[in-house]
Amino acid sequence: MFSKQEAQQLKKEFWTAFGKSFPRKWILYDTKIKDFSFKFSADNKKAEVSLDIEMKDELFRNAYYEKIWSLEDMLKDYVGEFSKDEFYTLENGKIISRIWVEKSGVSIFNKNTWQEIFEFFVEKMDGFERFYFDFEEWL
């Protein structure tokens, strides 16, 4: 177990190592669609790459979610199997729509799994970005 400070330091080292290992400018928040972003996340049990649709207006959020969902088979071609939740609740209680891919059995606190996480991040985020670029006009 790590102290809070040790955990923060390891997280900082993890993200720095990822950036140095795979120096690339990702789309992330620069989608040109407000509150529509791609995210990386990792904790002590898993790593995730997600598409978060965070519009406050539920009608807009649901409309974007439905557009993505209508392209489900195409998205699978880009990222493989994925999970989805139209009403995903964040830790802060905010409701968003999320589509994500997950890799379990890895930990941000285990340096031996970092390379595996980095490769997962690159493969899946690249798939999400290619999907976005190919269908951007339709979204």
Report residues per predicted region:
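Charged, terminal alpha-helix-loop-beta segments
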Residues: 1-139
